[in-house]
């Protein structure tokens, strides 16, 4: 009986359904507190909702700020098209569309349990896999974000950990067709969230080192993956070149994000008006057009960084704290918080940092071969956000990898014992 219970607890199917139940419970509880008119509009008052509405109305990939400002490359294409399909089916800016989008987010987030379970099983053992799955089932950001953000965050988390799982499987079965599927999958992932590409070189290096074949054959496989990923993205890149007469591989908004994190509002000695309003920026965007607007913001951001190197480093340090703690002043916010949920999330973030560090140490000591691909997620993926803007939403794609590392830290004694036994 005890053995059956243990097997049940280690079942990825059970973990998935519990994870889905928790996310749906949070979704419906929180949605019940919000007026229906707000649910129908507020979650979509962002760039994704604006472009999706334009697509659903047959206007094309445009109108990024709810105004007729013409074509845009501000966003990667997959999630706006996905949301547009929901709008087309259930109506633009309706309560039903909100629930449909949030429900899909919950499913995406719960599905993370499957590839996460198998990644942990590959590195550790079944106890590690079960621990990783259960950690993800209750992971605060995994429960909260599907409701809070109608964005690609939950889908990106699923794709990010699926890429790690696919990488591990490719090392075990290096047939040519698997590399073809892997390259195509990478192309799709980049069209969902280009930031995932930051870990691609490290995963490819690991595959090159792990597959057993000649150097020439290994290089051919890696080149095939890269070419196929580029091929998948190429139609969108061509579309951007036709519309904007610029080389924009997937999305264009990085200069604006860089400026948002590096501008005179952060300088206490600046004589400029220390505020940024959405109205003013949208008005400027409408005046200049997307490319000129982004060039202006990029130039301003670079000039600010050049003139304020010390302040830039200080801001980057604050963003490092913010992306891992959810706020640049975690202790003060913990004391001021009037919500037990907010305090719990801050406390969980501390445990996540400690567990991630301990997990990396565990991998280095006991499973060193897996260090490169696993460490790329917490160490490389967030780097771009240290320069721009940060939030737990932006870190979310690497959260499943953090759950994996936390599980490795928790099951460290068993893994170390097994390693010594194998060595003996």
Where are these predicted regions, by residue range?
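Hydrophobic, aromatic-rich transmembrane alpha-helices
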Residues: 2, 114-116, 204-208, 323, ...
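Loop-to-helix entry region of an early transmembrane alpha helix in multi-pass inner-membrane enzymes
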Residues: 16, 73, 77-81, 91-114, ...
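Short helix- or helix-capping micro-motifs
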Residues: 19-22, 129-141, 158, 165, ...
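Extracytosolic helix-loop segments that constitute the early lumenal/periplasmic catalytic or substrate-binding loops
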Residues: 24, 28-36, 44-71, 78, ...
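Transmembrane-helix motifs of polytopic, lipid-linked glycan transferases
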Residues: 100-124, 161-165, 354-358
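Membrane-interface transmembrane helices that cradle and orient dolichyl/undecaprenyl
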Residues: 123-127, 155, 163-181, 185, ...
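Membrane-interface alpha helices of multi-pass inner-membrane proteins
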Residues: 132, 166, 178-193, 203-204, ...
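Membrane-proximal stem/loop segments at transmembrane-domain junctions that anchor or position
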Residues: 241, 247-322
């Amino acid at each position: 009986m005890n053995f059956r219970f243990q097997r049940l607890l280690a079942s990825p199917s059970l973990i998935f359904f519990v994870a889905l139940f928790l996310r749906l419970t949070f979704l419906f509880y929180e949605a019940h507190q919000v007026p229906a008119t707000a649910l129908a509009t507020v979650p979509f008052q962002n760039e994704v909702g604006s472009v999706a509405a334009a697509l659903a109305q047959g206007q094309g990939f445009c109108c990024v700020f709810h105004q007729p400002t013409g074509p845009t490359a501000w966003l990667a294409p997959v999630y706006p098209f996905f949301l547009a399909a929901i709008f087309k089916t259930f109506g633009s800016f309706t309560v039903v569309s909100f629930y449909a989008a949030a429900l899909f987010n919950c499913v995406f987030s719960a599905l993370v349990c499957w590839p996460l379970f198998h990644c942990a099983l590959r590195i550790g053992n079944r106890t590690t896999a079960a621990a990783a799955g259960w950690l993800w089932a209750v992971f605060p950001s995994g429960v909260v974000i599907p409701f809070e953000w109608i964005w690609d965050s939950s889908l990106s988390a699923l794709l990010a950990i699926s890429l790690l799982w696919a990488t591990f499987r490719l090392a075990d079965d290096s047939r040519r067709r698997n590399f073809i599927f892997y390259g195509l999958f990478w192309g799709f992932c980049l069209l969902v969230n280009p930031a995932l590409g930051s870990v691609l070189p490290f995963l490819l290096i690991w595959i090159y080192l792990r597959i057993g074949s000649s150097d020439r054959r290994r290089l051919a496989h890696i080149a095939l993956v890269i070419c196929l990923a580029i091929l998948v993205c190429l139609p969108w890149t061509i579309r951007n070149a036709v519309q904007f007469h610029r080389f924009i591989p997937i999305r264009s908004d990085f200069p604006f994000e860089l400026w948002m994190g590096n501008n005179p509002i952060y300088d206490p000695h600046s004589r400029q008006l220390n505020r940024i309003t959405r109205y003013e920026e949208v008005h400027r965007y409408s005046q200049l057009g997307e490319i000129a607007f982004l060039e202006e913001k990029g130039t301003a951001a670079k000039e600010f960084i050049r003139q304020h190197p010390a302040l830039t480093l200080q801001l980057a340090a604050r963003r490092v704290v913010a992306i891992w703690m959810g706020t640049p002043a975690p202790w003060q916010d913990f004391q001021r918080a009037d919500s037990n949920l907010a305090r719990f999330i801050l406390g969980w973030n501390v445990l996540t940092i400690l567990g991630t560090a301990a997990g990396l140490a565990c991998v280095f000591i006991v499973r060193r071969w897996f260090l490169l691909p696993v460490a790329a997620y917490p160490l490389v993926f967030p780097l771009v956000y240290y320069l721009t803007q940060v939030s737990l939403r932006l870190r979310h794609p690497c959260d499943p990898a953090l759950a994996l590392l936390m599980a490795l830290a928790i099951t460290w004694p068993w893994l170390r014992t097994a390693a010594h036994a194998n060595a003996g």
